[in-house]
Swiss-Prot record:
Catalytic activity, as annotated: Ca(2+)(in) = Ca(2+)(out)
Protein localization: Cell membrane; Nucleus envelope
Subunit structure: Interacts with MX1 and RNF24. Interacts (via ANK-repeat domains) with PRKG1.
Family: Belongs to the transient receptor (TC 1.A.4) family. STrpC subfamily. TRPC7 sub-subfamily.
Organism: Mus musculus (Mouse)
Protein name from the UniProt record: Short transient receptor potential channel 7
One cellular component (GO) term of this entry: plasma membrane
Topology with respect to the bilayer: Multi-pass membrane protein
GO biological process: calcium ion transport; manganese ion transport
């Protein structure tokens, strides 16, 4: 019984498999396209074949003569005749089909022609009545589908491209300059997507309905906006548009991390476009137009120096190839040696002598500039190179003062920590130690001068721009620590002076050895070993040491000026960034083992051979110095026979050393090596970009004199102050007059005079608007038009010089096929005409022969 059931089950399974195989065989490999609705008549099949292969005579004849032909019929793939003709670049067939009314899927044919770059077919389709209003060019296929029809549909399943792809977006994606120009003239535009965090109803609804489609639509729009074809032809200022768009795309790369690579690629595409336009400049005028923007709207300084707004923007957005481009660097170098044109071609020795001369005569040069800032010498000192040299010399002197201030302790201090030393018997010891020396007084003057310079920079740039530069933060920290150090030192001096005043008033003895003083006074007579840990002088000395370290580290700021040291400084900065990234993992591992080891050994304080791990502080010190091999294994050994605790300590300590030293430190070394290799591979661009940032900080007007010479205001400063006060008073008077006029106009609101005046004002504003609309292009616009024209021509030439690909070979094949059908048609027409002529001749000759035969017969009869 069991065997019979098993046999029946196996037989049923084989029957099922045979039926399934039979169904698959019936469906065949093209089952997906064998739908009932796609059956065609022989006439329709011939019509579609003729449209596909460019048989113009057959298509024309069938469209003109056939009464039953459905010219919107589709093949097995769902394509109609128009789509087949466009896909195979048959212009004449397309023009014949476009003459028919109610032609379907014209929009998809347009998208197909754009994707293949068929310019003439695009022009023919755009002349179709469906595009008369131009509204269809601004709507996406999805919006068209929601409104009325399948205008952009590939088949009944939808469009062949994404639902958000408009013709102008597709043309921009394909870098079709001519098609983009045609669509722009038709009024098509690419709408910039809303901000990523936009909460409007439209964005909220799209995000809720399909977040993926919403993100893809944003990506497609940005691809169109970032294309060189659209940037070149749609914007009045393509350079500014490309720079701002590159920054926006770089910001989106950090926000939409799932599309990070795509956004970074688009951002780099915008940067390459700007570099390409700059590369096409042929003279200084064009380079200045690129670097400064619209020169007619540019605010020039009193000394006729441009603001270099585009370079500042490129540096802010880190468009390094643009800033490091030879055209840009040559212009910056010319401005760098402004008023010193002869020095640029001199040797290094001559330049060194010039720097040495400035170092020696800096005080005298400062006095000369105070007296005559507009003289030839003043103009020379205002040149960026001389400003850089003056500031570098001033800072070098400041560092020298720091060294001199510590020179008296190079061989060790004379007074030990447990000793005191005074100038006279009744002098308080702390009065002598807290007094400021002459070098410290000079250092304070330099610090005040640098603080004033930083305040002016904050005033000119604004706090937001100021904090974006790391060197500004370093300067701010260094100066703040110096101020805190000197403040603490001054507070200690005040307290010591108060103690000295008490001694001078109330102590009558000659010395202070046997005098009983109040505790608050006696404290200032103690040696250093008895000072409180929170003593202001101790805090001052600690802060001063930190400030000195930061001061010497600031030398790296001027290193990019040198070609040899510049790349090293850049590599050092990148290394610091890698260390900060590494610190996240390092701190996580370090804290984990520190807390674990502390919990393990905190109960054994006094029961170990050293105090390691018995407190949090000792745990930190032991683990930190263990990284550098300065901790001993005995740190985990106990005096008691608690082997379990010791074994766990050995294991944890060993795992820590393996993790930190073998794994993490080697990973940090690999990261640093990788960063250095990246800098070395593009060292020239990185160095020139860093040098341009350094140069640009000296191009702005003002801050000519370095610290501490900038503390004394020059006559020019008083003149600028008076002019600024004058402008403020004028603006105040004008605002009051305008307010009074507005009050008067409000009183005459219902009068006839008010109405007449309002109408006259409206007419004047309309005239001004019309004049501004039809005004002549500015010099900057002419230059940009010239450059963009070169860029477009170069792009087209580069595209034509590419190798012939498979698509172009297919186009040639289709053209030959169309030509063959045309020749066959002409041959058939010629053959028909020849047959008609032969028939006519035969008929004519037949009539003549009959007449001759009759004459002969009549003659015989006669």
């Amino acid at each position: 019984m069991l065997g019979s059931n098993t046999f029946k089950n196996m037989q049923r399974r084989h029957t099922t498999l045979r039926e399934k195989g039979r169904r698959q065989a019936i469906r065949g490999p093209a089952y997906m396209f064998n739908e009932k609705g796609t059956s065609l008549t022989p006439e329709e099949e011939r019509f579609l074949d003729s449209a596909e292969y460019g048989n113009i005579p057959v298509v024309r004849k069938m469209l003109e003569e056939s009464k039953t032909l459905n010219f919107n019929c589709v093949d097995y793939m769902g394509q109609n005749a128009l789509q087949l003709a466009v896909g195979n670049e048959h212009l004449e067939v397309t023009e014949l089909l476009l003459k028919k009314e109610n032609l379907a899927r014209v929009g998809d044919a347009l998208l197909l022609a754009i994707s293949k770059g068929y310019v003439r077919i695009v022009e023919a389709i755009l002349s179709h009545p469906a595009f008369a209003q131009g509204q269809r060019l601004t709507l996406s296929p999805l919006e068209q589908e929601l409104r009325d029809d399948d205008f952009y549909a590939y088949d009944e399943d939808g469009t062949r491209f994404s639902h958000d792809i408009t013709p102008i977006i597709l043309a921009a994606h394909c870098q079709e300059y001519e098609i983009v120009h045609i669509l722009l003239l038709k009024g098509a535009r690419i709408e910039r997507p809303h901000d990523y965090f936009c909460k409007c109803n439209e964005c909220t609804e799209k995000q809720r309905k399909d977040s993926f489609s919403h993100s893809r639509s944003r990506m497609n729009a940005y691809k169109g906006l970032a294309s060189a074809a659209y940037l070149s032809l749609s914007s009045e200022d393509p350079v500014l548009t490309a720079l701002e768009l590159s920054n926006e795309l770089a910001r989106l790369a950090n926000i939409e991390t799932e599309f990070k690579n795509d956004y970074r690629k688009l951002s780099m595409q915008c940067k390459d476009f700007v570099v390409g336009v700059l590369d096409l400049c042929r003279d200084t005028e064009e380079v200045e137009a690129i670097l400064n923007g619209d020169v007619n709207l540019q605010v020039w300084s009193d000394h006729h120096r441009p603001s270099l707004s585009r370079i500042k923007l490129a540096i802010k957005y880190e468009v390094k190839k643009f800033v490091a481009h030879p055209n840009c660097q040559q212009q910056l170098l010319t401005m760098w040696y402004e008023n010193l044109s002869g020095l640029r071609q001199q040797s290094i020795a001559v330049k060194f002598l010039a720097v040495f001369g400035v170092s020696i005569g800096l005080p005298f040069l400062a006095i000369a500039y105070w007296i005559a800032p507009c003289s030839k010498l003043g103009q020379t000192l205002r040149s960026p190179f001389m400003k850089f040299v003056a500031h570098a010399v001033s800072f070098t002197i400041f560092l020298g003062l720091l060294v001199v201030n510590a020179s008296d302790r190079f061989e060790g201090v004379k007074t030990l920590p447990n000793e005191t030393f005074t100038d006279y018997p009744k002098q308080i010891f702390r009065v002598k130690t807290t007094q400021f020396s002459w070098t410290e007084m000079l250092i304070m003057k330099w610090v005040l001068g640098m603080i004033w310079s930083e305040c002016k920079e904050i005033w000119e740039e604004g706090p937001r721009e100021y904090v974006l530069h790391l060197w500004n933060l370093l300067d701010f920290g260094m100066l703040s620590i110096f101020v805190a150090s000197f403040t603490a030192r001054f507070m200690a001096f005040l307290k010591a002076s108060e103690a000295q005043l008490y001694v001078d008033q109330y102590v009558q003895d000659v010395t202070l050895h046997n005098v009983s003083l109040p505790p608050e006074v006696a404290y200032f007579t103690y040696a250093r070993d008895k000072w409180w840990p929170s003593d202001p002088q101790i805090i001052s000395e600690g802060l001063y040491a930190i400030a000195v370290v930061l001061s010497f580290s600031r030398i790296a700021y001027i290193l990019p000026a040198n070609e040899s040291f510049g790349p090293l400084q850049i590599s050092l900065g990148r290394t610091v960034k890698d260390i900060f990234k590494f610190m996240v993992i390092f701190i996580m591992v370090f804290v984990a083992f520190m807390i674990g080891m502390f919990n393990l050994y905190s109960y054994y304080r006094g029961a170990k051979y050293n105090p390691a791990f018995t407190t949090v502080e000792e745990s930190f010190k032991t683990l930190f110095w263990s990284i550098f091999g300065l901790s001993e294994v005995i740190s985990v050994v106990l005096k008691y026979d608690h082997k379990f605790i010791e074994n766990i300590g050995y294991v944890l300590y060993g795992v820590y050393n393996v993790t930190m030293v073998v794994v993490l430190l080697n990973m940090l070394i690999a990261m640093i090596n990788n960063s250095y290799q990246e800098i070395e591979e593009d060292a020239d661009v990185e160095w020139k970009f860093a040098r341009a940032k350094l140069w640009l900080s000296y191009f702005d007007e003002g801050r000519t004199l370095p610290a501490p010479f900038n503390l004394v205001p020059s006559p020019k400063s008083f003149y600028y102050l008076i002019m600024r006060i004058k402008m403020c008073l004028i603006e105040l008077c004008q605002s009051k007059a305008k307010r009074c006029e507005n009050d008067l106009e409000m009183g005459m609101l219902n009068s006839k005079f008010r109405k007449t005046r309002y109408q006259a004002g409206m007419r004047n504003s309309e005239n001004l608007t019309a004049n501004s609309t039809f005004s002549k292009p500015t010099r900057y616009q002419k230059i940009m038009k010239r450059l963009i024209k070169r860029y477009v021509l170069k792009a087209q030439v580069d595209r034509e010089n590419d190798e012939v690909n498979e698509g172009e070979l297919k186009e040639i094949k289709q053209d030959i096929s169309s030509l063959r059908y045309e020749l066959l048609e002409e041959k058939s027409q010629a053959t028909g005409e020849l047959a008609d002529l032969i028939q006519q001749l035969s008929e004519k000759f037949g009539k003549n022969l009959n007449k001759d035969h009759l004459r002969v017969n009549q003659g015989k009869d006669i």
